[in-house]
């Protein structure tokens, strides 16, 4: 009956607040039974103040009823509420962890299709350097371990000797040397100092020791690969190594995997004890090679391969003169202008010119590349397609318009690294009119200073390489090993220096639009190139190791 009366009493006060009703009943009704052992007291026997329950909001009682004293709450509801608290706690921890991770995440641009998305930065854009906050997340980590213990076996205990001809120009040879060290490491072979093969175009007979510091090269890699200066004395017929098919591995595919060398080349080296690899242009891949081998290639490229001291010193002088041409220290831009006759011909692209120029270029192409030329009837459509795809070299005038749209003023000091430009001064006129301060190494140094370096074409190329490498802004106009190695080295040095890679495909559309105004063109150029400046980005699959060494060769700072 008491329980029935309790219910009736609650019902009669239904119009009042539940909390107030409960409080009133506790104080006035003689029929209310106290279910706690101490009646209206707390667990320690002291009277419980009614405001304790009133201070808790309604949502608290509904979500966490087991904190209250309501006997009507079932054990099942208590379990559900406990589970809810546990889920909320885990979600909170995950959220906090995600926020901390986001705050500590290194700056890294990521590609979504053809669009490169980069994290937002607070700094105002600068024409001369990348934002500081975008360049502090990564550091080089391919240098050799100081005080490390070498696990290399003695020279007579390696699997044999490997020998390569480094073909092409200076930069192609540089890549071949890096790959040769990596291949020797993969096969645990001794590397014979690579021979720089005479280039058919440059007719240069430079030896390794004429351009690179051999002692530093061998010493820096002494814990990685066994390197000897010459073919061992016990191998008497040295001419055989240069010409004999029996001593040459010729079937190495381009961008071969490390496993290919272990399965196909190593057995022949073990059998013959000394083998030449030929040809050796781009004969080692990137993403099919262990990370430690890719890191070794960076070690060779950025640390072991140093130019001779006299080349380094002359380059430093050119850089200093370039910065101080106006009497005050100023930043300078380096422009790799690839518009030589050979490059224009090989591209099979169509360029502005007179009818006579076009006829002569057609004759030149037919002579140099007869199989590709055929009868010439298909070349026009091919040229249009290549231009749309961004596969044609930028003309000097096009480069000038792009740089002006990016905001570089007329007074900009520009170092030009280039061979003889196809079309001569007439072709260079638009660029020189917009940027009159165009400078070459011949303008910065006297004839006597360059005499020593003229003995070897590769020495002159090395000077261009170093002056471009140390510039505040580097601009490429077409692909190639020179630009690729420059951009990669500047990234490895910290991403701070801008390395601009024009989007030639998009620019061809803008140049070909007769209705596009200057303001719209400027906006297109700025938006397109704001992330094409050598910012941190994963190496694979968008880049090879030489243009972007981040993934295998750089660590979080």
UniProtKB/Swiss-Prot annotation:
Tissue distribution of the protein: Widely expressed with the highest expression in reproductive tissues and roots.
Domain of life from the UniProt record: Eukaryota
Record membrane topology: Single-pass type II membrane protein
Disruption phenotype: Homozygote mutants are non viable. Heterozygote mutants display affected pollen germination.
Region (Disordered): 1-54
Compositionally biased intervals (Low complexity): 7-20
Glycosylation site residues: 156, 188, 324, 375
Subcellular location: Golgi apparatus membrane
Function according to Swiss-Prot or TrEMBL: Glycosyltransferase involved in the biosynthesis of pectic type-II arabinogalactans.
Protein name per its UniProtKB record: Protein PECTIC ARABINOGALACTAN SYNTHESIS-RELATED
Provenance organism: Arabidopsis thaliana
